[in-house]
């Protein structure tokens, strides 16, 4: 295992030790700048592609999609490859992850939200 892969795995293990929303915010604040390169490039992260394939197969994507825990937009990127006209709103607890998503221009809207708080901002009709 390369040093980069070991560092990435150590970071991933840290995610399993998070217990509060503030822990999550702090963790992803530091991880956001290299999240995509670590998971996608270094570790061959395929989860976003798997999720996008399931969404396209199981749901009508004519209506808006809510990407909860959108992070840096990896899932939205895969959805757009399969359904280019999909309308996606993203929600994440980390402003740093949202900022990276915003730069990719994949979402209709992005919202920083702790899912333990009120979900009123999500009271839209989503198809998925």
Language-model region placement:
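N-terminal, positively charged/glycine-rich alpha-helical extensions of SAM-dependent methyltransferases
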Residues: 1-34
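A short acidic, Gly/Pro-enriched loop at the edge of an enzyme's catalytic core
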Residues: 120-128
């Amino acid at each position: 295992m390369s040093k980069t892969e070991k560092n990435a795995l150590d970071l991933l293990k840290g995610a399993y030790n998070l217990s509060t929303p503030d822990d999550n915010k702090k963790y992803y604040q530091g991880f956001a700048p290299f999240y995509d390169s670590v998971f996608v490039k270094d570790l061959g992260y395929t989860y976003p592609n798997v999720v996008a394939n399931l969404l396209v197969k199981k749901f009508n994507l004519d209506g808006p999609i809510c990407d909860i825990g959108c992070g840096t937009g990896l899932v939205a990127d895969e959805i757009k490859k399969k359904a280019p006209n999909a309308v996606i709103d993203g929600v994440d607890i980390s402003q740093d992850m949202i900022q990276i998503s915003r730069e990719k221009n994949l979402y209709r809207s992005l919202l920083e939200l702790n899912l333990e708080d009120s979900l009123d901002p999500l009271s839209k009709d989503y198809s998925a």
